[in-house]
């Protein structure tokens, strides 16, 4: 399977949300209105031709990430648009500038560089370089420190907090019978699709809990900034993620702090981009020094820095929330690993809890755009009301098979690679989100659990993106 395509692929075998090369953002052309009319043609060489006035060369289209988020023309991110702030080149540029400022003792312009590593890229890199997952994290710390990074963190604490917030949000909705079916929100490709394609119909059902990436952004730019006494605007926060759509998520205006004049996440690079950086350095990951990941949140470090959450590889939302709801709503303590029933395909599964012969909880996992489209259509036909929660991920097999994970290099089929990564994930230690470390974060920095401050910092909102029918859908830049 190729990593890139010129259009969104929606076939049974290959329905990744791959970045699109087709963008419909129009060029504004200033011209006086003709009284008699004229024929207009945009030619292949970018010339704008009007029969009465000759040719006018069009300027190159400059498209920002904000344009992508506000545009209703395509479903998700664009590959060839001018994304200058979300690339490994930009990261290297910032690191080099920072090193020069340190060398010249220009302390006013020195930034604190923080790198956050998600679990799925660590699995991908560990498999690529044939090393352990924890060692992959430690070697990456060595690599980024060699470039000038100050802190290299894992997303563990943010993953834990996301589950705590999402499970409580579900229980509150269930008890109030409000906006069910609840749909997970950690996948930016799915959220972008929901905003642009279904808008206000679907958005009330989407969980308001921020994704682990954006929770990590809050922790770094507010809590870590306070702990190390550095203004948030002087921290450059980079995340390593398994999909390109995380770049769009980081660029949402909702995640820009006017008070701090900075984004929660400044730059997102992906697994495949890290591989490219290592390839350009002509040095495999295993040859970099081993450094333990940093843990600035408390004096007590966790035993491991890379953890699994339940059985599923996309954060464990469906399984964890199902267990929590069963216990706290129906007093059912489900201690064994849950088994989801496969429906039409391996990427659509469900699980049911019954009491006295009655279904009281019904959850599902829907991965891949084929299943997402079916899911939304069922909801529109009011046939989905018996699902209480659905974990939704845009990529088949979920985040472990994200569109920016390292692809097979030896003729290996993508599904075989996914199976190998799943094995690595299942061998990781399991994290229980409600632990002393997350309690410390809530009590010391968020005024406790379910407070106004915790809601403000850990939740977000979504926006109906209205289609502009004046834009032609057949303009390819």
Curated annotation (Swiss-Prot):
UniProt-listed InterPro entries: Cytosolic_Fe-S_CAF (IPR050340), Fe_hydrogenase (IPR009016), Fe_hydrogenase_lsu_C (IPR004108), Fe_hydrogenase_ssu (IPR003149)
Annotated [4Fe-4S] cluster 2 binding sites: 187, 243, 395, 399
GO biological process: iron-sulfur cluster assembly
Keywords attached to this entry: 4Fe-4S, Iron, Iron-sulfur, Metal-binding
The UniProt record lists the keyword DNA repair: no
GO MF annotation terms: 4 iron, 4 sulfur cluster binding; metal ion binding
Gene3D superfamilies: 3.40.50.1780, Fe-only Hydrogenase (Larger Subunit), Chain L, domain 3
Lineage top rank: taxon: Eukaryota
Pfam family, one: Fe_hyd_lg_C
SMART domains reported for this sequence: Fe_hyd_SSU (SM00902)
Binding site for [4Fe-4S] cluster 1: 23, 68, 71, 74
Family: Belongs to the NARF family.
Task of the protein: Component of the cytosolic iron-sulfur (Fe/S) protein assembly machinery. Required for maturation of extramitochondrial Fe/S proteins.
Protein name as annotated: Probable cytosolic Fe-S cluster assembly factor GM20417
Source organism: Drosophila sechellia (Fruit fly)
